[in-house]
């Protein structure tokens, strides 16, 4: 079965508010085997909401509408849904009595406007709200099920778990959604899609989604099936050929970030790592230390933003800086060697470059980045030219450095 979620409230269209309810509902519906195919946010506009409800109920089996059940004039959900379905909206004496008792128990005065919350759509069932004063409603229309839920997350979650899930369990066919998340480093989104599209386009189930971030691509496979074993078989049918095509560019098959994967490899080897950073100003060290237990393998870092610090803390020679510049293969190599020498770490990573928006050296274009790794076997330096703003470039190069470390540990050929 397919579902749609409609979030109501003009405040949800501002940059200050985030619709977290839809994330929760999507996770819960997926557990039932229900696929959420559409989400939208609509302001406090009765006509727009009514139009959306008509479209959603006509095409999806489950429609969940969140918010807009309060007592004020801008709480338009009840009126809009009644309008969309051409049903009456009437004052329900039982709900009104319940509301009056709620206010009395709290020793609060019930304002006249609160009676708006006692209006019920013709044919709807009441969903009690034990955490607020906005009852929900459940109704059926043309074979579809619609739910009206309160906007406050603590009210919505309690109502959905106690009132909606039992009802849905009775009407939703038994189905399972199985997922597989692969994460890839070392290639761009368009190159990756061109390589694997001939595989995944053969299948409607599992569905394949590609999500790209700076230096990191996620491949999401979602299989809808009757049993977990059937779903796993469907996933394997698609994932197998993709894994053969991508090879060691895949660094995670369970959604783990690159810093988590690298941390696991270092722990397994009882190895350590340190960092020496210039352009990234500590971002690489921060990523490594976000992993719980990273003190087992992270020895420390040096932020050597100017040449004086590179010389004093890392022992980079003045001759290298003068002849090649701070942004160069030679400086990156010297930084990694110096950091490893001073910390006695198994591995040392270094980053130097021009992150922008301007470059300190007119000979070095913005986006020029060098990262180096040093270990007992020697050093390796990788140079890349990145596009984007300052933050994006810095994120790209930290991803490149972490992947360089992963490949060094596992003995893969560097292609990042």
UniProtKB/Swiss-Prot annotation:
Organism superkingdom: Bacteria
Pfam families: CinA, CinA_KH, MoCF_biosynth
InterPro entries per the UniProt record, alphabetical: CinA (IPR050101), CinA-like_C (IPR036653), CinA_C (IPR008136), CinA_KH (IPR041424), Competence-induced_CinA (IPR008135), MoaB/Mog-like_dom_sf (IPR036425), MoaB/Mog_dom (IPR001453)
Family as reported in the entry's similarity comment: Belongs to the CinA family.
NCBIfam families documented for this protein: cinA_nterm (TIGR00200), PncC_domain (TIGR00199), PRK00549.1 (NF001813)
Protein name: CinA-like protein
């Amino acid at each position: 079965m397919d579902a749609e979620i409609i979030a109501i409230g003009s405040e949800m269209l501002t940059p200050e508010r985030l619709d977290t309810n839809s994330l929760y509902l999507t996770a819960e519906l997926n557990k039932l085997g229900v696929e959420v195919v559409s989400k939208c946010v609509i302001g406090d506009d009765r006509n727009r909401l009514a139009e959306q409800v008509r479209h959603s109920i006509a095409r999806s089996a489950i429609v969940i509408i969140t918010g807009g059940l309060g007592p004020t004039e801008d709480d338009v959900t009840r009126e809009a849904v009644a309008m969309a379905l051409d049903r009456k909206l009437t004052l329900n004496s039982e709900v009104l009595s319940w509301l009056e008792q709620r206010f009395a128990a709290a020793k609060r005065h019930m304002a006249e406007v609160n009676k708006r919350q006692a209006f019920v759509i013709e044919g709807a069932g009441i969903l009690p709200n034990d955490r607020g004063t906005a009852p929900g409603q459940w109704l059926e229309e043309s074979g579809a099920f619609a739910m009206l839920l309160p906007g406050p997350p603590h009210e919505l979650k309690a109502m959905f778990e106690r009132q909606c899930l039992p009802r849905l369990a009775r009407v939703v066919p038994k189905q399972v959604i199985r997922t597989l998340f692969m994460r890839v480093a070392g290639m761009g989104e368009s190159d990756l899609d061109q390589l694997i599209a001939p595989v995944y386009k053969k299948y409607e189930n599992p569905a394949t989604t590609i999500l790209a971030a700076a230096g990191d691509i996620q491949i999401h496979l979602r299989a809808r099936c009757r049993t977990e074993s059937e779903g796993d078989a469907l996933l394997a049918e698609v994932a197998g050929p993709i894994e053969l095509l991508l090879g060691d560019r895949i660094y995670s098959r369970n959604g783990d970030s690159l810093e988590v994967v690298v941390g696991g490899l270092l722990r397994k080897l009882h190895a350590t790592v340190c960092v020496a950073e210039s352009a990234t100003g500590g971002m690489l060290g921060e990523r490594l230390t976000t992993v719980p237990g990273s003190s087992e393998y992270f020895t420390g870092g040096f932020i050597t933003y100017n040449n004086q610090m590179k010389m004093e803390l890392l022992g980079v020679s003045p001759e290298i800086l003068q002849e090649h510049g701070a942004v160069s293969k030679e400086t990156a190599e010297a930084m990694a060697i110096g950091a490893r020498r001073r910390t006695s770490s198994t591995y040392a990573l270094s980053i130097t470059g021009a992150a922008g928006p301007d470059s300190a050296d007119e000979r070095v274009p913005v986006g020029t980045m060098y990262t180096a790794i040093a270990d007992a076997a020697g050093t390796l330096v990788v140079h890349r030219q990145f596009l984007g703003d300052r933050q994006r470039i810095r994120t790209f190069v930290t991803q490149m450095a972490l992947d360089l470390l992963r490949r060094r540990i596992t003995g893969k050929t560097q292609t990042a």
